[in-house]
Every structure is written in C-alpha cells, then in structure tokens.
Amino acid sequence: MSGPLRKHHPLLKVVNHSVIDLPVPSNISVMWNFGSLLGLCLVSQILTGLFLAMHYTADVNLAFSSVAHICRDVNYGWLLRNLHANGASFMFICLYMHIGRGLYYGSYFYVETWNIGVMLLVLTMATAFLGYVLPWGQMSFWGATVITNLFSAIPYFGPDLVQWLWGGFSVDNATLTRFFAFHFFLPFMIAGLSVVHLLFLHQTGANNPTGLAGDVDKVPFHAYFSYKDVVGFVVLLAGLVFIALFSPNLLTDPENYIPANPLVTPVHIQPEWYFLFAYAILRSIPNKLGGVVALAMSIVVLFFMPFVHSSRQTSHNFRPLAQVLFWLMVVNVLLLTWLGGQPVEYPYIFLGQAASVIYFVNILLFIPIVGYVENKLLFS
C-alpha cells in the first residue's frame, strides 16, 4: 500500500486523525491550548501519584507518618509530593481557563462535547477532594467530615447514605481506605472520558474565535499547533517546577501539617482554594438542604448553557453587552473564591449571599435577556 504508514496502519491512523492530520481552524488563539495542557497535567498527576502510592499507607494511624516518610526518606519523595500537590492547583487553573474559553466563544453548542466536559469537571473535583483527605491532617479529617455530612441533607435515606460512605458511624479507617481506592481509580476514569471528549470534538471539528464555520480555512494540527502546544507545555512545567521547588506551600493550608485529631476542631474549616467559590455558595444559604442544592447547581448550571444562549451569534467576540456579563461572572467567581476563605461573620455572610444570587441570576436570567436585546438591536 502506498503512502505513509501512519495513514493506513490500524492503530497509527487513529493517532494520525487525532493529532497529526487533524484539520484545525487556522485562527484559533492561545486560549485553545488549555485542552492539551489539561492532558499534560493529567499524565503528570497519574505518574507522580503512582510513585507516591508505592510509599503511602492508607491507615489512620500511619497515613500522616507515611507522607512525612515520603518527604524525608524516599529519594526525591519531597519533589514528587510537591509536584503532585501543586499539580492539582495547576490542573484546576487550566480547567477553569478551559471552561471560561468555552463560555466566551460558545463551545457549549457542541452539546455532547460540552456535557462530557462538565462530567469531567465533576470527576476531577471528586478526585481532588478524595486526594485532600489522604494526608490525614486536620483539614483532611474535618474537610472529609463536613463534606460527606452534606449527604445527610438528602431526605429519607440521607443519614444511612452518610454511614454507608463512611463505612461506620464516623470518618475512620474504612473511610480513608475507600477514599484512597477511589482516588487511585478515578484519574483513569477521567483519562477514558477524556478520550470520549476528544472523540466527540473531532466529530464536529474545533470551534474558533469568530464563532463562524471554520471549514473555509483549516490547516493540519501538526506542525502548526503541535509546536504551539509544546510552548504551552514548557511554560506550564516551568511554572509547576518553580512553585514545587521555591514555594511548595503557597497554595496549601498550614492546618494540614497538624495530624488529624477528632477532638479538636480547626478555627476555620475550608477546602482547597479551587473549591472556595462553590463552598461560598454552600455557606450563603442558612438551610442545610438548600445549601447542598445550591452547591450542586453551581456546577449543574453549566449543563444549561446551550439552552440559555438566545443570541444569534455564537461567540462573545462581537457582543459588547454579553462581554460585560461574561466579565461580571469572572469577577463574581473570583469574589466568591475570596469569600469562601473568610470567616462566617458580617460582612462576609451578606457579601457571599449577594455574590451567590448574582452568580445564578447572571447565567439563568441576564444572559438570555441580553441575547434577546442584542438580536433586536442588530437584526430587527
């Protein structure tokens, strides 16, 4: 058979159609780099996590000591732990940038790709939460207690569900063991779902900044965008290594360097920084069930994006009114992130409630109204 091997070999042609001869709109910007950066983060997390798992012990009496042992006695264990802990932060930075790009340029019109992406977000958040419990420090233990306790708000079978999750009547050895098992398993599930995400993306082709059909001007992915992705890889890895070497505790909670003690509650229980926006929404509602519903809806609302978009234009590029709403949403999420780390007192309670209302009203009410107004102004 004539032609390059990559074009007719059963395995290589799949790779060829995905990353070599894939037709890509020629005008996609650096904002389209975050998908590949997420792939790099996932590979990095799986590799560092695999080596950490070789030395970690999932037992309430030994977990904290085993993490200390990794950092002190294992060759480059301190580096593996720092890369893994900070790699999670970098992964969420890329994830939120990737979602932000999708919202700005209307990528949610590729409904299957978008919905699988939101599922990937939920799985990644679950994986990160499970991983935060494993060092068995104070914030690990109390974070696990508080978050799993939220399931007790589910009517009728909530309390039984919580005991089933715990494997007993409190967060204990059974909880830690199962959390470790799921933390090990879920990244591979994320990797599998990412392949499905790419499969659906390549069925429709990539979006582009204009929001118009990009079929008129496409170029092969390699070498135009493969080298562009490599530049992103270098920048991301340089940033990750810099943080891991020079300021490894910049993004972590010092409370987690205290071994877990069920008899002493930390002054302020809070999750890692990348969950603070959702935590602020949870805290803003004084009712337990209402808070849990609001927390779930803060992520589920992303599924509604294709339905609340009423404008005849896909991208925000040429929609000044919609751009104002988009940046309002970005600033609001940053404000919620800050509020989630503040104590539960005035004025933070009121500000959290106001920001939570703005978050939902902006997506479910303002976005469709502004789209309708723009249609009237531009096309009527």
From Swiss-Prot:
Cofactor(s) required, per the database record: heme b
Annotated coiled-coil segments of the chain: none
UniProt-recorded Gene Ontology molecular function terms: metal ion binding; ubiquinol-cytochrome-c reductase activity
UniProt KW keywords: Electron transport, Heme, Iron, Membrane, Metal-binding, Mitochondrion, Mitochondrion inner membrane, Respiratory chain, Transmembrane, Transmembrane helix, Transport, Ubiquinone
Name of the protein described by the UniProt record: Cytochrome b
Additional remark text: Heme 1 (or BL or b562) is low-potential and absorbs at about 562 nm, and heme 2 (or BH or b566) is high-potential and absorbs at about 566 nm.
PROSITE patterns in UniProt: CYTB_CTER (PS51003), CYTB_NTER (PS51002)
Gene it is expressed from: MT-CYB
Binding site for heme b b566: 98, 197
Assembly information from the UniProt record: The cytochrome bc1 complex contains 3 respiratory subunits (MT-CYB, CYC1 and UQCRFS1), 2 core proteins (UQCRC1 and UQCRC2) and probably 6 low-molecular weight proteins.
Functional summary from the UniProt entry: Component of the ubiquinol-cytochrome c reductase complex (complex III or cytochrome b-c1 complex) that is part of the mitochondrial respiratory chain. The b-c1 complex mediates electron transfer from ubiquinol to cytochrome c. Contributes to the generation of a proton gradient across the mitochondrial membrane that is then used for ATP synthesis.
Binding site for a ubiquinone: 202
A single BP term in Gene Ontology: mitochondrial electron transport, ubiquinol to cytochrome c
CDD domains (alphabetical): cytochrome_b_C, Cytochrome_b_N
Sequence positions that bind heme b b562: 84, 183
Annotated TM spans: 34-54, 78-99, 114-134, 179-199, 227-247, 289-309, 321-341, 348-368
A GO cellular component annotation in the UniProt record: mitochondrial inner membrane
Free-text cofactor note: Binds 2 heme b groups non-covalently.
